[in-house]
Curated annotation (Swiss-Prot):
Record keywords: Cell inner membrane, Cell membrane, Ion channel, Ion transport, Membrane, Transmembrane, Transmembrane helix, Transport
Subcellular locations according to the entry: Cell inner membrane
Similarity field: Belongs to the MscL family.
Gene (UniProt): mscL
Subunit-structure text: Homopentamer.
The protein's name: Large-conductance mechanosensitive channel
Major location category of this protein: membrane
Membrane-spanning segments: 10-30, 76-96
GO molecular function: mechanosensitive monoatomic ion channel activity
Described function: Channel that opens in response to stretch forces in the membrane lipid bilayer. May participate in the regulation of osmotic pressure changes within the cell.
Gene3D superfamilies (UniProt xref): Large-conductance mechanosensitive channel, MscL, domain 1
Keyword Cell membrane: yes
Taxonomic placement: Bacteria, Pseudomonadati, Pseudomonadota, Gammaproteobacteria, Enterobacterales
Membrane-related topology note: Multi-pass membrane protein
GO cellular component, as recorded: plasma membrane
Length: 136
C-alpha cells in the first residue's frame, strides 16, 4: 500500500476529519472570545475601576539601562487572558452539557421494534388461521 493511499485513508476517517473541523472552529471561536474580552468587556470594566486600560497594567521590575530594555511584568495582559479562558471554559461547559442532554434523550428514546421477518409473518398468518378454525 502506498504512503499516499494510507495517508488518504487516515485523513478521511471520521474522527480525524471531525477533529480538524473542531480545531478550525475552535481557533475561530478563540479569536471571537479574545475580541469580546479585549474590545467589549475590558474597556467598561477598566472605566469602572478608574479609566484603566488593562493591556497597559504592568509592573516594572528593572528600568531600561542604555540599550538593555526594561524588565516588565505585564499582569494586565494576564488578567485579560484569564477572562478569555473563563469565557471559553464556560462556553465549552455549556456545549458539553447540551450534548450530554441530547445524548441522554437519544438513549431514553425506545428503539423501534424490528420489522417481522418473512417467517414471522407466515407464522402469524398460520396462527390467525388456526384461531379462526377454532372459533368455528
Amino acid at each position: 500500500m502506498s504512503i499516499i493511499k494510507e495517508f488518504r485513508e487516515f485523513a478521511m476517517r471520521g474522527n480525524v476529519v471531525d477533529l480538524a473541523v473542531g480545531v478550525i472552529i475552535g481557533a475561530a471561536f478563540g479569536k471571537i472570545v479574545s475580541s469580546l474580552v479585549s474590545d467589549i468587556i475590558m474597556p467598561p470594566l477598566g472605566l469602572l475601576i478608574g479609566g484603566v486600560d488593562f493591556k497597559q497594567l504592568s509592573l516594572i521590575l528593572r528600568d531600561a539601562q542604555g540599550e538593555i530594555p526594561a524588565v516588565v511584568m505585564n499582569y494586565g495582559a494576564f488578567i485579560q487572558n484569564i477572562f478569555d479562558f473563563v469565557i471559553v471554559a464556560f462556553a465549552i461547559f455549556i456545549a458539553i452539557k447540551l450534548m450530554n442532554k441530547m445524548r441522554r434523550k437519544q438513549e431514553d428514546t425506545p428503539a423501534a421494534a424490528p420489522k417481522p421477518s418473512a417467517e414471522e409473518k407466515l407464522l402469524a398468518e398460520i396462527r390467525d388461521l388456526l384461531k379462526e378454525q377454532h372459533k368455528q
